[in-house]
Curated annotation (Swiss-Prot):
It comes from the Eukaryota. This is ATP synthase subunit beta, chloroplastic. Produces ATP from ADP in the presence of a proton gradient across the membrane. The catalytic sites are hosted primarily by the beta subunits. It comes from Ipomoea aquatica. The keyword Nucleus does not apply.
């Protein structure tokens, strides 16, 4: 991994002899800059606009095109208000570089790696460029292994792959943020890992809410910031398209350092991957490229691949990525989600219906899928248990119309037993979270995969048919459910 040791930890690497150009054209966030003959900067180099009297205006741009006639076209990473033709632009000689390492934990950064949380400068002298190639084949760890989350519904029915990519589908208010925070908490405790959250084109309010909730739940430790378990990188929807297009790479670069240098398991959240594509589409239009299908950029697959292929397991560690996916107009054939799906190993679908019932986490057990749920990967016992759970829930779903019209009494004895077990399974799929202790009062539970399988096998076998279904609601393992049933009887 290429690391730039610097003395200041600034957002761009500096070179001794400045290569200076001048702005000749400004169109919104796009600048055309003329350089002296033979001094053209490379593609992806960071340029810094100099203010009058050598004052920096703090506008950093990234070279996107070499136009000929000693001119380059660059995209700004912040607002271009106040810029004028003739202003000096200095070529830094390197791509945008951002701080990396343990001192990034508990902090909020923008696309340039500058802290935006008013907690002072980042205590590090190590930076890394945001553009790099994916790991070579020889470095990859091709072994298929399950990434245990300690969340029953995920581990049993749609297990995550270590170093894989997971799509998280959910609307507002169904518990997406709480699920994200629980995953961050569990990876820190069970795997000794850290997390990086990349807010790509999201609402400023949502980013602020997530930060405050993380502080409240202890994921970010206010008293001792370095003890925190997550670094946050935000490029909000009010920022120029250049910033929104590159903020995912900034977050990924921080995650890669933890994987390659610290040799840790890293969880990388990207919310929302669609906004990354959308920003790329805006930049593509500004650069004058001919649009492709549905108005998207012609380089859609390449841009998505350059991000996704860097998210992988190596011999040193792993980056497991959870990406929120917005589906425009619920059209799964839209080029943006369709391109994303090609890279996903699992999908976790959050259901408003389950959230309305109070089943948390509100993960839909029938809609969520995983390529890992195969007997040769998870073993026969896990696979058979998961399939029987899904069959029971599917049968219950089919019977719900009959129950609504005629009532339970009209069902056959076998169907009534199926419904009773399905309702127990549905409730047993709920679980108290560590990060929700603050407002539920129930201590959180981490349930290992073996315990999860044992619990569902006992429900399916009929051994627990005599227990009331409310005993299975918001408990950890099956022993807690039986103990709760005893308390309900007394």
């Amino acid at each position: 991994m290429r690391i730039n040791p610097t003395t200041s930890g600034s957002e761009v690497s500096t070179v001794e002899k400045k290569n200076l150009g001048r702005i000749v054209k400004i169109i919104g966030p796009v600048l055309d800059v003329a350089f002296p003959p033979g001094k053209m900067p490379n593609i992806y180099n960071a340029l810094v606009v100099q203010g009058r009297d050598n004052e920096q205006t703090n506008v950093t741009c990234e070279v996107q095109q070499l136009l000929g006639n000693n001119r380059v076209r660059a995209v700004a990473m912040s607002d271009t208000d106040g810029l004028m033709r003739g202003m000096e632009v200095s070529d830094t000689g390197a791509p945008i570089s951002v701080p990396v390492g343990g001192s990034t934990l508990g902090r909020i950064f923008n696309v340039l790696g500058q802290p935006v949380d008013n907690l002072g400068p980042v205590d590090t002298n190590t930076t890394s460029p945001i553009h790099r190639s994916a790991p070579a084949f020889i470095q990859l760890d091709t072994k298929l292994s399950i990434f245990e989350t300690g969340i029953k519904v995920v581990d049993l029915l749609a297990p995550y792959r270590r170093g894989g990519k997971i799509g998280l589908f959910g609307g507002a208010g169904v518990g997406k943020t709480v699920l994200i925070m629980e995953l961050i908490n569990n990876i820190a405790k069970a795997h000794g890992g850290v997390s990086v959250f990349g807010g790509v084109g999201e609402r400023t309010r949502e980013g602020n809410d997530l930060y405050l909730e993380m502080k409240e739940s202890g994921v970010i430790n206010e008293e001792n910031i370095p003890e925190s378990k997550v670094a946050l990188v935000y490029g909000q929807m009010n920022e120029p398209p250049g910033a929104r297009m590159r903020v995912g790479l900034t977050a990924l670069t921080m995650a890669e350092y933890f994987r390659d240098v610290n040799e840790q398991d890293v969880l990388l959240f990207i919310d929302n991957i669609f906004r990354f594509v959308q920003a790329g589409s805006e930049v593509s239009a500004l650069l004058g490229r001919m649009p492709s299908a549905v108005g998207y950029q012609p380089t859609l697959s390449t841009e998505m691949g350059s991000l996704q292929e860097r998210i992988t397991s190596t011999k040193e560690g792993s980056i497991t990525s959870i990406q929120a996916v917005y589906v425009p107009a619920d059209d799964l054939t839209d080029p943006a989600p369709a391109t994303t799906f090609a890279h996903l190993d699992a999908t976790t679908v959050l259901s408003r219906g389950l959230a309305a019932k109070g089943i948390y986490p509100a993960v839909d057990p029938l809609d969520s899928t995983s390529t890992m749920l195969q007997p040769r990967i998870v073993g026969e016992e896990h696979y058979e248990t998961a399939q029987r759970v899904k069959q029971t829930l599917q049968r219950y779903k089919e019977l719900q119309d009959i129950i609504a019209i005629l009532g339970l009494d009209e069902l056959s004895e076998e169907d009534r037993l199926t419904v009773a077990r399905a309702r127990k399974i549905e409730r047993f799929l709920s679980q108290p979270f560590f990060v929700a202790e603050v407002f539920t009062g129930s201590p959180g539970k981490y349930v290992g995969l073996a315990e999860t399988i044992r619990g569902f096998q006992l429900i399916l076998s009929g051994e627990l048919d005599g227990l009331p279904e409310q005993a299975f609601y918001l408990v950890g393992n099956i022993d807690e459910a039986t103990a709760k049933a005893m308390n309900l009887k007394t």
